[in-house]
């Protein structure tokens, strides 16, 4: 019955823990109340035992020892089953956690893919907004026509738009990240709160249980003390009673012996028998009563002792191990046991003595019945009794000592209790600290929520600001419309006013012209009167001459004597002199009048010139203002058009933003489901962001390169504009550049400091890495030492095994020897003794086998530890290998970056070469312009030569037609009237134009002011927006830093948890040690119990010994169970350690990835530093170049000013020379009268000199002609050189362009040809200078000769002197021209030097352009000056030719007269000859006087006319010069104003850009600081992890020490076993005597042994099941790890595909940006060509008056041609756009195909993984379902298992499906007798969200992935649920945005859904 009862109880205990319910994976409770125990039949008065953690003190014992053993066995079985069930539940929990983690990873991968595809879709949307790409139009027409000035606005608007888009994207991404982080943080906090709550509950429950146990133990100890005291007293009493009884027995024996001696033999025998029987009866009674009482007390004590032992074991499992004290207690118990045995032996000997004495009495009575005699007791008996008494006394003393020791132990236990209480207090403190940290984290969460709200408020504010900006835009449009209306009105008003003012001015000019004409007519009349008076005077002089002739005739007639003739001659001479004086006075008067006329004429010509200059200036102003007005109108139109475009784009963007916001709201539900995927996908996003940023940087670099290439095209047309703009802005830009350079230097200094800090941190990291490597090496050495120690331990274990084998052999031999001796001694009971011995031998063998199994289990534990250590070593080696691979990756990255930098340097060199080519092209164009100007000059020279020929012809005509002067005068007057009329008309037109231009300028200024105000408002708004964005960035950075701090705090908490787990594992090890020690103490106590029971009786002693043997067996079984529990615990510990290792791996991966990110960020910072350094170096170089160019410009300006001063000095010298000439002319006239007397004397010398001088003049003329020819040849050669230079430049430009297109340009082209030509020119100029010097020497000689022959100069010499003076003046002017030529040479040299400098510098176009423009202007001025000089030289040459002709004629006349005189002089024939001579002389004199008068009059007339003509020409020239100067001044003013406006605009834009750059830099700096803080925190965490690893190593060392201690303990235990073997040898002798009594109980023992064997078999079967389950779990873990690796590979492939697509898209975007910029630059080029054409037309100001209409027509034609070219260029651009679009479409199709392939592969892999998991779960469920039957099976059928997962909804419909992966749901989900199915809420929510999202927007890649995910989940659920739910279908009818997908895609989707 007892067996059946125990079996039923075992069944009940097995069935009760099977039904396990769990609401969550956090807590698992063993529900023992689910099954009613009433259903189970329990009989035989057996009780039900509750399954509690502590063993209660109310255990009911049976009536016999057999019942006690069965009850203890049931308790152990129950405990074992409970622990197994707990282990199974823990395994289920772990597997469920693993499944949840895997599902989280899968979801995170999916979410990352969705986010990446969203980013791609967002980039597509932005591309659609930013680029207006037409898909279908074949012909391309420009949407807007903008000038160069408007292009800047367009570029700025594009930049602002791009920035706005980027900010919008960043804000949306940050919002999504914030929401995602918030949700993830909330989920983590909820999980941690649950974990903390469960831990707190467990700790409170544990502490309460421990306190209860300690109190119970304390009570039990007190009870034990009392029992020991009672036992002591009872033993003392028993010993005293025994002493008394022994004394009485001895006395009675002595009395009986005396009586026997005295009495008779028969009576004595009877009496003796009776007395002996009575004595024996009394002795037995006295002995039985106390022994029976002690046996009952002993049983009670043993029960309580067992309870105390168990509780002490539990206490020691929680407290510190006190092995030494337990060993001392065991030794004391052994001593008491030995003493007890000795006492039992003593009592047995007494009994033997009594029996022997009784037998001896009988024998003596039989033998010596006849002989009377006495018998004395032997002395040995007395000695033995005395020894026993002495031993008893010593034992009593020893027991007293033990009591004292027990008191000390009680004190120690009290101290332990206090220690446990202190530990409890510490745990309470830790709990309080944990709660505080939880509160802090909750506060941080609240702060994060607040900040999120703030960010949302800021976003609302940004939206309101956007609305305000739109309103402002509308206002601007209205203002622009008003301005256009105002401009139109102002145009009409201005034109009307200008017409009116022109009419008024015309009238005024006409009045002035009439007044001038009246004045001129009056003056002409006066001149005619004077001419008439002079004629009358001439008539008088003629009459006087006639009278003189008559007188001369009368004198000839009357001369008879020479004296009378001579006197008469003298008188006539005197009369002639008087007449000459009168004529001189008259001539002086005439000259004065001529001077006055000349002054008046000069004033009039000056006024006319001024008027003409004013008219020209006004015309130029009119043209410029009209052009500016047109440009402004175009700008306004473009601005309005751009504003409209921007409004449309903003509306599109807003619509897209609204759509995105709706999509975001629709997809929030999906984001909630995919929250757990965020942590895994965030790293991917970060890597993708880094890739995107690197790609953006590459895009920006490529864009910069494209911009540079495009700027090369624009620079060809924008040179003149840039020159005019940058001429005056250099100084301001220099100052600003200085300030910018200072700021950049400060930034550089700060960046260098930061770089130094980063370098120091990098050094610290390297040092930490070295330290970590050293630690790893040390750990490796320690591990080697541990391995050696383990090997030593293994050898020691083997030696111990050998010793045990030897001991077994010795024991077997001893038993055989004992049995042999026993067989020889006892022949009666041989069979029984043999059987008994066999049983004992079997029992001993089983004991030894159990010990061997224990040792093997210890061996297995050590081997497992060794394996764990080896795994750790392998992991460390893997970590080292990973670090090496990472180092190699970093090296490769650095190499790639270096290659990229080299490529960038190559691109920069290409840019620089292209710039040099542009400069050369510009120079060639300038050379072409110079050629054109030189050709124009040649045409002008030819024209001037023609004019000279015409002037010569006119002079001849004037000489021949002297009578026609009056008619010519009338013609000239008419022409002057016409000119005046034209001048007045031009004035009126000019004034009208001026007024119009002023009005237009005023209106334009107002419009510009308004535009500037609008721009300022927009800039203020932009700055405010930038500030807000910066504030948002700062808040976001703060949020990220806080989140990182929270993450680091969480990591620290996790580390603390790991430490606490390690301590708990150490405590568990200590508990295991204590349990082993307590087991040994239990064994010793069982032995003591068996020895105490032997003291009752021999039979009871044998029974008690058997009970002790059974207890030892039970203890062995309990040890086996404990070992199994240890195995389970070790498995759990290994799993936990594996989990920890995995966590550490994950953390290590996190750290590695963070470290990579930080390295990448450091590299980026380095790149930024390099870029900043490059920018600073460029800025410095630009400043240096600007400074150099400023110096050059200043020097050139100084040179120009010096030249201007020289020209002024030359003009003054010319004036002085004219005055000097006039003075000399007067002096010459005076000297003619004085030198007339001397003329006859020096005629001969004069004739010779004249002939010589004539030859010299001819030589000079020839030389002059040669020099002119040489100049012409030089000019032609210069022009040819320029042409060749231009051709060479064009050829070089083309060659370099071809090279730059195909190959990188190598070196710059030398200008050797230009240098050679310049050298030729220099040599020719030197030759001309030599000739000039020769001319000067010859002129000096002529002057000297003239000074020597001054006395012999005649009247005609005065004319010659004037001619010489004119020649001298011409030579002076020629010298000036030569000086100017020398200056031109110097300028050419300077130009050559500048060209060389430009070739050397090659980096800054602006400075080169400025210098080039200045040089061109200087050359233009010099050319103009040379033209003026050439005109002057030509005029002087004409004058000199006229003079030469006059001199020749006069020379011929002089020679004829001389010949006549010579013929007349030698002959002296008397008075007739003298008279004839006198008459001839008189006639000659009259003819000479007549000719002189005629010549004088002609000279005066010609000089007056020439002077008038010269004055007119000079006045016209002056007026033209003034007009040109005024035009230049006006142009400069206008250009300066426009440049100032543009520079202001540029500076404002630059300031805005600089502010934005500063804001970006500050934001970036803050980000870097935050990242540095994060890096430092991560470094601290890394250090913390290192310290933890060190602590873990220390713990391992401690464990090794514990292992060594266990080793020593095992050795001590072996020693104790040897001692026990000795005691067993002693007991063997006793057992031989007891074998006869134990034979009866053999059958009961055999039955019990069979029961135990059956139980052992059951335990082994259960152990095999557990092992199978463990193997299955390991297989599942391996499968899941493989799946994770597959998913990681898929993720890597997806990342590669995404990166490739992103790179392709970036390339496409680059090409599109390049095309757009080319379009814009072409627009700029067209505008700049128009401006250059206008400037060229303005530069040709001299021909503007005559060629305005032609130029307008040419301009219109050119504009039409440019427009046609523009249309062609735009068509080309459109074609390129189409090609790019087609390529984009192809790439998008490829992307879609790749994505579809990826999705299909993912779906397939996911389906395969889910199928595999479902199969595994079904298999495991089917394997685990065989255990339950009966009512338990009904419970399992009633409780359907469901997985607690989020995505993989595995549902089982079979009632028998039970698995270790799943737990029983609550009553809400499951009911008894019914099947319940559960679909996760994630599928429903995802279905709803997908349907909603597909109704709005086009089908994107993310929707495809969601559809596939839904399909996969539905398919998985269908397979798990036997297709309980159909797959969800997407509503495709609502999809709008793109065309339907191809049929293949639909078929694939249908196939996936059907699968």
Swiss-Prot record:
Subcellular location: Cytoplasm, Cytoskeleton, Microtubule organizing center, Centrosome; Chromosome, Centromere, Kinetochore; Cytoplasm, Cytoskeleton, Spindle; Chromosome, Centromere
Any GO BP annotation: meiotic cell cycle
InterPro entries reported in the protein's UniProt record: Rootletin-like_CC
Biased composition (Basic residues): 1938-1948
Coiled coil: 82-129, 152-317, 385-1747, 1770-1813
Taxonomic source organism: Parascaris univalens
UniProt keyword list: Cell cycle, Cell division, Centromere, Chromosome, Coiled coil, Cytoplasm, Cytoskeleton, Kinetochore, Meiosis, Mitosis
Annotated region (Disordered), positions in chain: 1865-1896, 1912-1955
Protein name in the entry: 227 kDa spindle- and centromere-associated protein
Highest taxon above the source species: Eukaryota
Gene: PUMA1
Lineage: Eukaryota, Metazoa, Ecdysozoa, Nematoda, Chromadorea
Extent of Polar residues compositional bias: 1878-1896
GO cellular component: centrosome; cytoplasm; kinetochore; spindle
Keyword Coiled coil (UniProt): yes
Role, per record: May play a role in the organization of the spindle apparatus and its interaction with the centromeres.
């Amino acid at each position: 019955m007892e067996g059946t009862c125990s079996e039923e109880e075992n069944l009940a205990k097995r069935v009760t823990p099977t039904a396990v319910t769990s609401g969550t994976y956090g807590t698992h409770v063993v529900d023992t109340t689910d099954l009613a125990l009433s259903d189970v039949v329990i009989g035989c008065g057996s009780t039900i035992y509750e399954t509690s953690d502590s063993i209660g003190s109310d255990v009911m014992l049976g009536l016999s020892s057999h019942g006690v053993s069965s009850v203890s066995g049931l308790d152990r079985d129950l405990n074992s089953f409970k622990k197994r069930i707990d282990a199974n539940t823990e395994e289920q929990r772990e597997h469920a956690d693993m499944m949840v983690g895997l599902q989280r990873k899968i979801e995170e991968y999916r979410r990352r893919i969705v986010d990446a595809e969203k980013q791609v879709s967002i980039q597509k949307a932005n591309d659609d907004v930013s680029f207006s790409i037409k898909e279908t139009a074949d012909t391309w027409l420009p949407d807007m026509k903008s000038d160069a000035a408007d292009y800047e606005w367009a570029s700025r608007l594009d930049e602002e738009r791009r920035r706005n888009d980027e900010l919008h994207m960043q804000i949306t991404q940050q919002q999504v990240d914030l929401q995602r982080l918030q949700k993830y943080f909330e989920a983590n906090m909820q999980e941690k709160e649950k974990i903390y709550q469960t831990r707190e509950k467990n700790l409170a429950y544990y502490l309460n249980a421990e306190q209860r146990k300690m109190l119970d133990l304390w009570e039990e100890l007190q009870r034990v003390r009392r029992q020991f005291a009672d036992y002591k007293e009872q033993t003392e009493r028993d010993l005293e009673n025994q002493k008394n009884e022994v004394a009485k027995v001895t006395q009675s024996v002595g009395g009986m012996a005396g009586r026997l001696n005295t009495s008779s033999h028969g009576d004595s025998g009877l009496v003796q028998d009776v007395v002996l029987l009575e004595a024996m009866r009394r002795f037995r009674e006295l002995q039985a009563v106390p022994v029976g009482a002690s046996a009952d007390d002993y049983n009670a004590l043993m029960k309580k002792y067992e309870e105390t032992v168990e509780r002490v074991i539990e206490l020691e499992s929680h407290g510190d191990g006190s092995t030494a004290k337990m060993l001392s207690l065991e030794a004391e118990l052994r001593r008491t046991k030995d003493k007890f045995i000795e006492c039992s032996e003593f009592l047995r000997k007494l009994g033997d003595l009594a029996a022997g004495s009784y037998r001896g009495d009988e024998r003596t009575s039989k033998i010596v019945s006849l002989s009377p005699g006495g018998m004395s007791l032997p002395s040995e008996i007395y000695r033995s009794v005395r020894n026993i008494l002495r031993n008893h006394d010593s034992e009593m003393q020893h027991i007293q000592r033990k009591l004292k020791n027990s008191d000390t132990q009680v004190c120690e236990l009290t101290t332990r209790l206090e220690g446990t209480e202190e530990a409890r207090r510490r745990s309470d403190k830790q709990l309080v600290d944990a709660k505080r940290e939880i509160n802090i984290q909750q506060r941080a969460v609240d702060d994060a929520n607040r900040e999120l709200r703030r960010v949302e408020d800021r976003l609302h504010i940004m939206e309101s600001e956007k609305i305000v900006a739109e309103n402002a835009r509308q206002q601007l449009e209205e203002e622009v419309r008003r301005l256009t209306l105002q401009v139109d009105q102002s145009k009409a008003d201005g034109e009307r006013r200008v017409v009116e003012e022109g009419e008024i001015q015309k009238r005024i000019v006409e009045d002035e012209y009439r007044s001038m004409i009246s004045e001129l007519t009056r003056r002409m009349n006066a001149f005619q009167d004077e001419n008439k008076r002079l004629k009358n005077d001439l008539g008088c002089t003629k009459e006087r001459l006639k009278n003189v002739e008559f007188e001369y005739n009368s004198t000839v007639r009357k001369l008879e004597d020479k004296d009378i003739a001579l006197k008469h001659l003298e008188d006539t001479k005197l009369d002639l002199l008087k007449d000459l004086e009168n004529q001189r006075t008259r001539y002086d008067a005439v000259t004065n009048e001529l001077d006055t006329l000349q002054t008046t004429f000069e004033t009039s010509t000056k006024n006319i010139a001024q008027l003409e200059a004013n008219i020209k200036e006004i015309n130029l102003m009119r043209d410029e203002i009209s052009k500016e007005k047109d440009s402004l109108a175009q700008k306004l139109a473009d601005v309005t058009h751009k504003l409209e475009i921007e409004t449309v784009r903003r509306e599109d963007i807003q619509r897209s933003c609204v759509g995105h916001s709706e999509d975001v709201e629709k997809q929030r539900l999906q984001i909630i489901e995919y929250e757990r995927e965020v942590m895994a996908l965030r790293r991917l996003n970060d890597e993708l962001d880094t890739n995107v940023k690197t790609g953006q940087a590459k895009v920006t670099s490529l864009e910069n390169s494209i911009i540079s290439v495009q700027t090369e095209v624009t620079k060809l047309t924008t040179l003149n504009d840039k020159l005019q703009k940058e001429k005056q802005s250099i100084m301001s830009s220099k100052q600003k550049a200085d300030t910018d350079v200072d700021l950049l230097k400060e930034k550089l200094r700060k960046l260098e400091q930061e770089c130094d800090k980063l370098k120091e941190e990098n050094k610290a990291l390297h040092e930490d890495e070295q330290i970590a490597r050293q630690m790893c090496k040390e750990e490796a050495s320690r591990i080697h030492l541990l391995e050696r120690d383990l090997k030593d331990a293994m050898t020691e274990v083997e030696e111990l095994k050998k010793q045990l084998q030897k001991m077994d052999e010795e024991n077997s031999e001893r038993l055989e020897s004992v049995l042999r001796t026993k067989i020889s001694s006892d022949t009666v009971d041989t069979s029984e003794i043999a059987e008994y011995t066999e049983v004992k031998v079997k029992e001993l063998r089983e004991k030894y086998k159990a010990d061997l199994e224990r040792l093997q289990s210890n061996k297995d534990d050590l081997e497992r530890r060794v394996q764990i250590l080896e795994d750790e070593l392998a992991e460390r080696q893997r970590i080292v290998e990973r670090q090496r691979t990472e180092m190699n990756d970093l090296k490769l990255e650095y190499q790639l970056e270096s290659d990229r930098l080299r490529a960038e340097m190559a691109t920069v060199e290409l840019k620089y070469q292209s710039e040099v080519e542009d400069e050369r092209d510009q120079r060639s164009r300038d050379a072409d312009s110079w050629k054109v100007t030189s050709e124009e000059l040649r045409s002008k020279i030819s024209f001037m030569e023609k004019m000279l020929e015409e002037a010569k012809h006119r002079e001849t005509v004037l000489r021949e037609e002297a009578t026609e002067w009056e008619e010519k005068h009338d013609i000239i007057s008419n022409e002057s009237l016409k000119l005046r009329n034209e001048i007045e008309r031009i004035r009126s037109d000019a004034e009208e134009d001026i007024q119009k231009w002023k009005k237009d300028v005023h209106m334009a200024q107002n419009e510009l002011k308004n535009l500037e105000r609008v721009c300022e408002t927009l800039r203020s708004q932009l700055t405010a927006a930038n500030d807000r964005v910066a504030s948002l960035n700062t808040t976001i950075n703060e949020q990220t830093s806080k989140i990182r701090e929270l993450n680091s705090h969480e990591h620290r908490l996790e580390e603390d948890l790991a430490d606490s787990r390690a301590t708990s594992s150490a405590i568990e090890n200590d508990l295991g040690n204590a349990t082993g020690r307590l087991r040994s103490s239990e064994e010793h106590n069982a032995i003591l119990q068996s020895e105490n029971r032997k003291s009752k009786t021999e039979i009871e002693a044998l029974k008690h010994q058997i009970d002790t043997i059974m207890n030892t067996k039970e203890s062995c079984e309990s040890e086996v169970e404990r070992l199994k529990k240890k195995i389970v615990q070790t498995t759990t510990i290994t799993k936990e350690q594996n989990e920890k290792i995995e966590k550490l791996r994950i953390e290590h991966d996190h750290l590695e990835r963070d470290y990579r990110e930080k390295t990448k960020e450091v590299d980026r910072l380095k790149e930024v530093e390099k870029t900043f350094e490059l920018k600073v170096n460029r800025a410095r170089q630009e400043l240096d170049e600007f400074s150099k160019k400023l110096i050059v410009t200043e020097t050139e300006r100084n040179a120009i000013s010096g030249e201007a001063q020289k020209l002024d000095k030359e003009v003054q010298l010319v004036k002085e020379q004219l005055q000097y000439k006039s003075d000399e002319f007067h002096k010459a006239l005076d000297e003619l009268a004085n030198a007339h007397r001397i003329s006859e004397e020096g005629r001969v010398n004069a004739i010779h000199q004249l002939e010589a001088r004539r030859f010299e003049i001819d030589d000079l003329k020839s030389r002059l002609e040669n020099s002119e020819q040489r100049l012409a040849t030089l000019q032609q050669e210069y022009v040819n050189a320029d042409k060749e230079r231009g051709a060479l430049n064009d050829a070089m430009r083309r060659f370099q362009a071809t090279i730059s297109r195909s190959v990188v340009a190598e070196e710059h082209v030398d200008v050797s040809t230009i240098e050679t030509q310049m050298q030729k020119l220099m040599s020719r100029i030197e030759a001309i200078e030599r000739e000039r010097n020769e001319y000067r020497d010859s002129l000096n000689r002529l002057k000297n000769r003239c000074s020597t022959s001054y006395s012999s100069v005649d009247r005609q010499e005065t004319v010659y002197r004037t001619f010489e003076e004119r020649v001298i003046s011409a030579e002076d002017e020629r010298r000036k021209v030569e000086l100017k030529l020398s200056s031109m040479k110097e300028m050419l040299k300077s130009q050559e030097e500048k060209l060389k400098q430009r070739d050397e510098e090659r980096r800054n176009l602006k400075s080169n352009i400025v210098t080039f423009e200045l040089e061109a202007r200087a050359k233009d001025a010099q050319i103009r000056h040379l033209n003026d000089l050439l005109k002057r030289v030509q005029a002087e040459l004409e004058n000199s030719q006229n003079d030469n002709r006059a001199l020749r004629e006069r020379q011929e006349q002089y020679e004829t007269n001389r010949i006549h005189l010579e013929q007349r002089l030698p002959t002296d024939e008397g008075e007739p000859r003298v008279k004839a001579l006198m008459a001839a002389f008189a006639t000659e004199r009259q003819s000479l006087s007549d000719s002189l008068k005629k010549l004088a009059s002609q000279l005066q007339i010609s000089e007056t006319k020439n002077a008038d003509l010269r004055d007119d020409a000079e006045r016209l020239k002056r007026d033209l010069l003034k007009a040109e100067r005024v035009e230049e001044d006006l142009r400069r003013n206008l250009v300066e104003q426009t440049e100032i406006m543009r520079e202001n605009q540029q500076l404002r834009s630059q300031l805005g850009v600089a502010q934005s750059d500063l804001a970006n830099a500050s934001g970036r700096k803050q980000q870097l600081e935050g990242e540095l803080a994060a890096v430092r925190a991560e470094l601290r965490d890394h250090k913390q992890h290192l310290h933890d690893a060190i602590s873990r190593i220390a713990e391992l060392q401690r464990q090794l020490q514990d292992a060594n201690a266990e080793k020593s303990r095992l050795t001590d235990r072996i020693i104790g076993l040897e001692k026990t073997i000795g005691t067993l040898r002693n007991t063997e002798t006793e057992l031989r005597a007891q074998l006869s009594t134990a034979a009866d109980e053999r059958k009961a023992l055999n039955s019990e042994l069979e029961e135990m064997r059956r139980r052992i078999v059951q335990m082994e079967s259960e152990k095999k099941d557990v092992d199978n389950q463990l193997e299955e779990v390991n297989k599942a873990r391996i499968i899941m790890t493989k799946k994770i690796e597959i998913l990681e590979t898929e993720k890597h492939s997806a990342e590669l595909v995404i990166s490739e697509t992103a790179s392709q898209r970036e390339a496409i975007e680059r090409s599109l940006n390049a095309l757009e910029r080319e379009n814009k630059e072409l627009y700029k080029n067209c505008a700049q060509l128009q401006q250059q054409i206008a400037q060229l037309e303005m530069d040709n100001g001299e021909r503007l008056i005559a060629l305005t209409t032609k130029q307008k027509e040419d301009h219109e034609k050119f504009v039409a041609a440019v427009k046609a070219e523009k249309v062609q260029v735009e068509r080309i651009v459109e074609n390129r756009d189409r090609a790019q679009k087609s390529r984009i479409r192809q790439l998008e199709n490829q992307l879609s195909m790749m994505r579809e392939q990826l999705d299909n592969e993912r779906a397939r892999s996911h389906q395969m993984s889910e199928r595999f998991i479902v199969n595994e779960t079904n298999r495991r469920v089917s394997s685990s379902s065989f255990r339950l039957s009966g009512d338990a099976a009904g419970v399992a059928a009633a409780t359907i298992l469901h997985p607690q997962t989020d995505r993989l909804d595995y549902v089982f419909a079979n009632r028998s499906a039970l698995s270790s992966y799943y737990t029983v749901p609550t009553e809400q989900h499951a009911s008894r007798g019914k099947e319940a199915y559960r679909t996760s809420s994630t599928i429903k929510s995802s279905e709803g969200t997908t349907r909603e999202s597909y109704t709005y927007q086009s089908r994107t890649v993310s929707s495809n992935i969601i559809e596939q995910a839904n399909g996969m989940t539905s398919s998985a659920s269908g397979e798990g649920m036997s297709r309980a739910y159909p797959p969800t279908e997407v509503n495709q009818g609502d999809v709008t945005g793109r065309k339907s997908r191809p049929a293949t895609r639909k078929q694939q989707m249908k196939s996936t859904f059907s699968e």
